Amino acid sequence: RMRLDRKTVDFRVSILPSVFGESVVIRILDRDSIATGVSDLKLERIGFNPEDLKRFRKAITRPYGMVLVTGPTGSGKTTTLYAAISEMNTLEDKLITIEDPVEYQFSGVVQIPVNEKKGVTFARGLRSILRHDPDKIMVGEIRDAETAQIAIQSALTGHLVLTTVHANNVFDVIGRFASMGIDAYNFLAALNCVLAQRLVRILCPSCRTLVKAQQALIEESGLDYEQYKETPFHEAKGCSQCHGTGYRGRKCITEFLDLTDEIKEMIHAERPLSEIRYRAVTDGMITLRQ
């Protein structure tokens, strides 16, 4: 941790030996900038489409159950949870988090940092949290079966649990928990919804150029050419406003699976994934591809 220009900056350093010397990766956390961004962070700014935003808000206002956010590393999962905490943080409820690391401190929220050297793991921390009379719990990440089991039991016993797990889409989450040996009945009984997300770059509005996409490119993207052949497309160019990159900022695209009774019954019956996906889309789910 360093003080630079009256700012507190944290550095997470990972060093790995290689045949050509040490490979170093540094993650920079500007806490003052994060504080400014998070203080103004609302779910509307994440990038939800209106229907997914409405459904996600409904899920995080339920008194109990589990809300799962999934995606690869660096897809904005923690930012989404922080936006949810900003809306959930009221005087009526006691909210406790366990994170690795705590990237931003919320007023009125009990936040616990993971410290494996001192024995504070996600699983042990979560067990301790349950003895502190929480109403809502945020678990930074589910990494093992023990943490998953405790989180599920917490959701089944009257707590709202928000957490993340690494998976490619909303349906892979089910397989991920199954691979941990988690009982499907309890897992589905606890689960309110699954949100999958990705971060995409935004074309610089100052220099983006209008182009006509080629048929091969449209089809390679998994889109129907006849449907999108007249759609205007833009591409990055680069200017002084975006430092020649062609992009300015990022936004989130989402895929929201509401665990309705019909979806749960299909999963319990081990119906093919294609049928479950078709049912979810019929119920209004917008996929990441869409």
Language-model features: locations:
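Short, flexible helix-loop junctions that flank or precede catalytic/ligand sites
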Residues: 1-290
